[in-house]
A protein has these predicted regions:
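Beta1/beta-strand and adjacent pyrophosphate-binding region of the FAD-binding site
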Residues: 2-19, 32
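Core beta-strand elements of the Rossmann-like FAD/NAD(P) dinucleotide-binding domain
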Residues: 7-9, 151-160
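Glycine-rich FAD pyrophosphate-binding loop
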Residues: 12, 28-49
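General beta-strand structural signal in soluble alpha/beta enzymes
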Residues: 34-35, 97, 127-129
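Glycine-rich active-site loop/strand segments that organize a redox cofactor
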Residues: 49-99
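Short beta-strand to alpha-helix junction loop
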Residues: 72-82, 99-118, 128
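A conserved short coil-to-beta-strand element within the FAD-binding core of flavoproteins
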Residues: 129-143
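Short beta-strand segments that buttress and anchor functional surface loops
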Residues: 145-149
C-alpha cells in the first residue's frame, strides 16, 4: 500500500462553523480548520433570516442545562456576550437589538463570517474547504485524520 501524503499541524479543528472559526482564531499559528462545505460559516449565513442573531447580551449561566452546571458559568466568565460584541464593534459591523437582548447584524450575516475569517487570517490559520473526513484516530501523542481533498486522500496529524 502506498504511503499517503501527510500533513502535520499543531492544532486541527474539524468544522468551519462559528465555534470552529472562533477556536481557530484564538489558538494561533499552526492551526488547520477543515470542513466539507464549499464555504465557511454556512449556518451563520442563514441564521437570523440572513442577519445572524450573533449574541444575546442577557445570556447567563442559568439559561443553560447541563449535567455540569459550572461549565456554562466557567465558559461565560472567560468569554461572554460583551466580549463578542467588542469584537463585532472592532470590525465596525453595525447591529441592532431586537427583543430580550438579541443582537442582529444590520446588514448581513456574511459580515460575521468575514470577521471570523479575518480573525483567523490575522493569526495565520489554514482553512481547507470541500474536504471530507473518512476516519479519526488517536495515535500516541497525536490525533490523525484521514481526509479527501481535491480527489486525493491525505492524512493530517495534530498535537491537539
Amino acid at each position: 500500500m502506498a504511503q499517503l501524503p501527510q500533513h502535520h499541524v499543531t492544532t486541527l479543528i474539524l468544522g468551519a462553523g462559528a465555534a470552529g472559526m472562533m477556536a481557530a482564531a484564538h489558538s494561533g499559528a499552526g492551526v488547520l480548520v477543515i470542513d466539507h462545505a464549499k464555504a465557511a460559516g454556512e449556518k451563520i449565513r442563514i441564521s437570523g433570516g440572513g442577519r445572524c442573531n450573533f449574541t444575546n447580551i442577557h445570556c447567563t449561566p442559568s439559561a443553560f442545562l447541563s449535567e455540569n452546571p459550572h461549565f456554562a458559568k466557567s465558559a461565560l466568565s472567560r468569554y461572554g456576550p460583551y466580549d463578542f460584541l467588542d469584537l463585532v464593534n472592532r470590525h465596525r459591523i453595525s447591529w441592532h437589538e431586537k427583543t430580550l437582548g438579541q443582537l442582529f447584524c444590520d446588514s448581513s450575516a456574511k459580515e460575521i463570517i468575514a470577521m471570523l475569517q479575518a480573525e483567523m487570517a490575522e493569526v495565520d490559520v489554514e482553512l481547507w474547504l470541500e474536504t471530507s473526513i473518512s476516519s479519526v484516530r488517536h495515535s500516541g501523542d497525536e490525533f490523525c485524520v484521514l481526509v479527501e481533498k481535491q480527489g486525493q486522500a491525505r492524512e493530517i496529524c495534530a498535537d491537539h
